[in-house]
Amino acid sequence: MRHRNSGRSFSRTSSHRKAMFSNMCCSLIEHELIRTTLPKAKDLRRYIEPLITVSKSDSVASRRRAFDILRSKSAVGKLFTDLGPRFAKRPGGYIRIIKCGYRDGDNAPMAIVELMDRPVSSDDTEE
C-alpha cells in the first residue's frame, strides 16, 4: 500500500528516478529549455526550484549541496555564476511549464519546461 507517499514512481526504481531527474536538471540548467512529458515536468519542479534557491547564496557548502544532486561541475558552475544572480530578486517560481500537445506514437501529453527571465536569442524571434 502506498499511503501518504508523495511523488510519482514513473515505473522506475528510486535510483533510476534520482538519476533521471538529476539528468533533467542538468539539461534544463545547460539549455534553459527542455521538452518532456507533462508528469515529469511537474515533478521536475520539486528538484530544480530548491537548487536555484540554494544557488542564490554562493558558498562552498551550497555548491556541494548542488553538486550532490547534479553531479556535473559545468552545471553547478552555470547554476551559481549565471542563474543564481539572475534570480536573486525573484522569491520563487523559477520555471514555466507550457503544455505543447501530445507525442506521436503513444499520445503522451508533452510539455516545454523553461527558465523564467530567459534571454531571448535570435532563433526564438524567427518563430
Swiss-Prot record:
InterPro entries hit by this protein: Ribosomal_bL17 (IPR000456), Ribosomal_bL17_CS (IPR047859), Ribosomal_bL17_sf (IPR036373)
Entry-linked SUPFAM superfamilies: Prokaryotic ribosomal protein L17
Coiled coil: none
Superkingdom of origin: Bacteria
Presence of the UniProt keyword Ribonucleoprotein in the record: yes
CC annotations in GO: cytosolic large ribosomal subunit
Gene Ontology molecular-function annotations: structural constituent of ribosome
Keyword terms, alphabetized: Ribonucleoprotein, Ribosomal protein
Cysteine-cysteine disulfides: none
Listed GO biological process terms: translation
Family under the similarity heading: Belongs to the bacterial ribosomal protein bL17 family.
Xref: NCBIfam families: L17
Binding partners and assembly: Part of the 50S ribosomal subunit. Contacts protein L32.
Protein name: Large ribosomal subunit protein bL17
Gene responsible for this protein: rplQ
